Structures are given as structure tokens and as C-alpha cells.
Amino acid sequence: AKMVVVDIDHPDIEAYIQWKVREEEKVAALVTGSRIVSRHLKAILSACVNCEGPEGDCFEPMKNPALKRAVRDAKKAQVPENYVKRVIQFARQGYTDIEFPVYDTDWDSEAYLTVSGQNSNNSVRVTDAFLEAVETDGTWDLRGRTSGKVTKSLKARELWDQIGYAAWASADPGIQYHTTINDWHTCAAAGDIRASNPCSEYMFLDDTACNLASLNLIQFRKPNGDFDIVNFEHATRLW
């Protein structure tokens, strides 16, 4: 996994906020669409194969009532017409079954492998100035990264609502409070903290390592059940 952080005044911030939502919607479309198409194509093929009329009539919707219904239902469900024609041609060639891939919403499924953004944690970097604009229903300027010029102005609450909806719909983006984080910065003279590791436990300067550590707390349990505070404090200082 990786962490991707974009500033709230970035000119592409709206597309970034909606990125994961759109990709999740693609998965929903793939899963639902594949099931609908598969069901209707099989129904069309079945109407051709199980026809009891003259052989030539079995593949003509105007002469095969069951096929006519199946084709009509498929068109109502928005199944592409070329697929409808193709499966009828398939039946003419003597085939009695058809394979059409059906996708599911499993995290490791092919549907998710076809969309982007699945290997990153996305967060938006917000400042106190932006939050104040949200609170007062003010406008917010998006600025070019190199020129600093305003590329778009919009209501701060509109942007905030986009963040809220996207987080509800797809669990991304997260929020990083830039002003607060840097108010607590222990090395402020070295520059701003602008991002974190993927889970946001560790925040520090650009291009510095994220060396996470853990302690087995059971090792600090004394024989009488008390917690060994002295040794625990010593261990934490080592990190």
C-alpha cells in the first residue's frame, strides 16, 4: 500500500476526491452488468435450442415466440444488440451453451483488478483556513501548483460535502489537518510535515523513513500481575 496526499487547494482536488467513488461504481457496473447480460444471453440461446418448430424458424424472432420474448427482454435490459445477434448465430452453428464471464465483488476478484486506485490510501490535506471557509460558507480558491494562480473558485462547503460523500461511499479520502499537524511539529525549522505513512501513525518530513516499532506488552507483566512501568519507559526511549 501507499499513501497519496493532495492539498485541498490543488486544481485537480475534485477529481481526486471522487476517484475511488468512480472506480467503485465501475465495479458495481461490471458485476451487475455481467450478471444481466449472462442471464439474457442464456435465455436467448435456450429459446433457440428448445424450439419445437421447423429448424429454420427457431432462429427467427418473428417465427419463434419464445425467442421473440427473450430478445425483447434482453433489449429492455440494455443488452448490446450485437451480443443478441451473436448468440443467435452461435445457436445456428449448433451450440447449446454459452460462456459469459460473471464478475463478483470479492476484493481479489477480476472486477477489482480492472479498476485503478486499489493499492493506495488517499487523503486530503486541509488547512484551518479551509475549515474556517466551510464554517462561514465562504468560497475556496484552487491554485496551480507552479504558477500559484487561481484556477477555480467554489464554495468550501461544496468541496467539504464531496469529501464526506466520497468517504461514506468508498472509505476514501481520509483527512489530514495540515495546520494542526504542523502546530505540533517537533522539528519545525526543518520544514513542514506534508504527509504520513499509509495508516497515519507516523508523520514527519518529506523523504524520511517510516520505521514503525512495536512492543510485546505481556513481557512487561510482573509475576504479581503489575505492569513494569520503569522497564516500559526505558524500552520506549530506545525507539
Task: Label the predicted regions.
Residues A1-H234:
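Active-site cavity-forming subdomains of large catalytic enzyme subunits
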Residues A235-W239:
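Long, compositionally biased non-active-site segments enriched in small/hydrophobic residues and glycine
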